Amino acid sequence: MLNELNNLFMILPNINPIIFSIGPFSISWYSLAYVVGILLGWFYATKIIEKFKPEITKKHIDDFITYAIIAIIVGGRLGYVLLYNPLKYFTNPIEILKTYEGGMSFHGATIGIIMAAYLFCQKYKINFLSLTDIITTVAPIGLFLGRIANFINCELYGRITNSSFGIIFPNSDLQPRHPSQLYEAFFEGLILFCILTYAVFRHDTLKKRGLNSGIYLIFYSLFRIIIEMFREPDIQIGFILDSLTMGQILSAPMLLLGSYLICRSNPK
């Protein structure tokens, strides 16, 4: 049967989620994605600041990195625990600490970053939207790498399909499925990065507080809502109101907020 399927669809090999281990110390694909994403985002943010001289300085970004790391990990994990699988983690709280096994929520990480950015701006007396405009410009880098890690780990895969895009994931039911992780990596990562880079370098959008943040929220939400149509819903949640997924519901407010930010943005 596998040979027949292999002739029709690509069968993804079962890749170890741990890249290597040295004693008790292990590096997972997830960890690598987060570390590389943060470093590349940090580097790109400093280059943007050097070129466009916005209100946010390089020192601000350097100081904010610690806030961002904590916000992404804590917010992403708690978001997943509370929104996607609360029963599992409340009955066995120690599982919450096992971030290396996966289970991070983008929407939770977003809330974490927003809270961290607000506290940081209050402390250093800088404009909140000026900081989020820089953050959202570099965020697609991390999104791209995170979705690639999801694909390697054979998780968050798509719905069953007979199309030529179908991939058989080794830890699934051997049904060909959409590689929705790659769809998200392409649109939420690569395409969104290109859109924001074009906006910054061609239209100097950093001069308008909140504009880049609004562009990011709108396009991310649209991409996520559409791609959720190809992604298998979380088994413990399933569909909501017969056809909606949790990802679509959580993306709707982001779409509205993005529209508001674009409408209110003005040169400063």
Swiss-Prot record:
Keywords of this protein's UniProt record, alphabetized?
A: Cell inner membrane, Cell membrane, Membrane, Transferase, Transmembrane, Transmembrane helix
Gene Ontology biological process terms in this record: lipoprotein biosynthetic process
- List cellular component terms (GO): plasma membrane
**Gene Ontology MF term list:** phosphatidylglycerol-prolipoprotein diacylglyceryl transferase activity
Q: According to its UniProt record, where is this protein located?
A: Cell inner membrane
Q: Which Pfam families match?
A: LGT (PF01790)
State where a 1,2-diacyl-sn-glycero-3-phospho-(1'-sn-glycerol) binds: 147
| PROSITE patterns per UniProt | LGT
Transmembrane portions of the chain: 18-38, 64-84, 101-121, 126-146, 181-201, 210-230, 237-257
Task: Report the EC code(s) recorded for this entry.
Answer: 2.5.1.145
- The answer, when asked if Protease is one of the entry's keywords, is no
Which superkingdom is the protein from? Bacteria
Q: What does this protein do?
A: Catalyzes the transfer of the diacylglyceryl group from phosphatidylglycerol to the sulfhydryl group of the N-terminal cysteine of a prolipoprotein, the first step in the formation of mature lipoproteins.
Q: What is this protein called?
A: Phosphatidylglycerol--prolipoprotein diacylglyceryl transferase
From which organism does this entry originate?
Answer: Rickettsia prowazekii (strain Madrid E)
> Gene name, please?
lgt
